[in-house]
Amino acid sequence: MGWARQPGLRTVQGVLEDALGKVLREPIQLTVAGRTDAGVHAEGQVAHFDTAAEFDGPQLVHRLARFLPKDVRVKRADVVPPDFDARFSAIRRHYVYRLTTAPYGAEPLAARSVVPCKSAVDVDAMRRASGLLLGLHDFAAFCRRREGATTVRELQRFDWERQGDLLLAHVSADAFCWSMVRSLVGAVLAVGEGRRSPEWVAGLLRETQRSSSVTVAPAHGLSLVAVDYPADDELAARNVQTREMRSAPAVEGCCGE
């Protein structure tokens, strides 16, 4: 299920707001750091809500566990400064994409979060291609266009880690536009499988619109693992800076960004 509440559909936002409403006995509206599409996971999602109610964080976490479904958990709850905004205060979002090169595919217990790929991928070539994408660029070729939204982003980390048969892509940026992370992974995986060159990936940065040659990697391999925030006394300034950078109601996150 995806994040955003939708009439008649089961979503993460919907089940969380309903559970919070039952515990706090008031309507709750969440603002989230990264809205994820259906199939994308989140291990380090951050959301905030406004309330006049007083509560103990650990006790709220314990009580929510009684109302939430097994596939949604709240791991921590804190009272934050008034200037904190889960979306606009964020300075960096971290994602991991999980692939397996095992000849038999993903382990059964990991099948919902690991995507099979070819066994003989050239990880060194993938690392070279990923390095060419780092920095402040227009990632239009990797993003699904949203009217009025910028596709300029600062890609701060994009590297690959081997753990046996597991191949992990670590991707971090100030923010991501819609489908960007999965498109980055799909493009670089094409290099690893010998279908494209690192230079082809770098050339995509010259495109001004979504490239039909870029394959979007499957949703279930992707997970939001962490969100970074500034010190409390820098929150207000960060909110203003982020709002000025976003010229339209673009959605921040990984795949529904």
UniProtKB/Swiss-Prot annotation:
EC number in record: 5.4.99.12
Recorded catalytic activity of this chain's protein: uridine(38/39/40) in tRNA = pseudouridine(38/39/40) in tRNA
Keywords for this protein: Isomerase, tRNA processing
Keyword match tRNA processing: yes
Subunit structure: Homodimer.
Family: Belongs to the tRNA pseudouridine synthase TruA family.
Name under which the protein is recorded: tRNA pseudouridine synthase A
Organism: Nocardia farcinica (strain IFM 10152)
